[in-house]
Amino acid sequence: QLNYDPTVAPMDAYCLYWLVNLAVGVPLDGYYTDAANALGDKTPAEAEEVINTLKTLDFNTIDTVAIMYDATDYLSGNAMYSDENPTDPTQFTGNLEASIEVLQNYYPQIRIIVMSPTYAYAVDENGDYVSSDMYIYNGRDVLSTYVIKECYSANIHSVSFMDNLYGSITEDNADEYLVDNLHLNVKGRKLIAKRFEY
């Protein structure tokens, strides 16, 4: 069990790992109070609603949990994985794997579907949109490698994986579905929802 330190990275309180722990009943109220105090007006607008929902939702009544990452980890140059500790929640895939393990331990009956990021443009030093298959942040890797690692993490935990990077919003059609380099427009959201139905 890691301890959360709001003085280092207060936004981490809202990452998947800590939210899943909150959902299974780990008492984390102090974490979120500390995070909100540290973030001030940068606290996510929906934070209180999400926290209250996760604390009160009966996951014994839930059939399926869908987990969808966008390309923020790639765009931020966050660390992707650790061979020494594959469930290190400070890593992109470690956070996912640790979260899946918590859900599977507490609610083995729930089907978990991991949904990959859709395509997102990288932004170069001049502020121009460039291919995320060509641009690397913080010496990490390209967006497609994040997705490949995410798929691997889903597979080793025997959960479903939905590939949005190549299966829905791609480099070829991204202009039609994004409002900027990352965020989906209404048409893009509908496309992902339609694909999720299958």
Language-model segments: which ranges?
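Catalytic His-Asp segment of secreted/periplasmic serine-dependent ester chemistry enzymes
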Residues: P117-Y198
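Hydrophobic positions in alpha-helices of CheY-like receiver
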Residues: S99-L103, C151
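Conserved SGNH/GDSL esterase-like catalytic core that processes O-acyl groups on lipids
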Residues: Q1-P86
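Structural recognition of the beta-strand scaffold that forms the well-ordered cores
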Residues: D63-M68, R111-S116, H157-S160
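The substrate-binding groove and active-site-proximal loops of carbohydrate-active enzymes
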Residues: S82-T90, M134, D180
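Generic structural signal for well-ordered alpha-helices
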Residues: L96-I100, S144
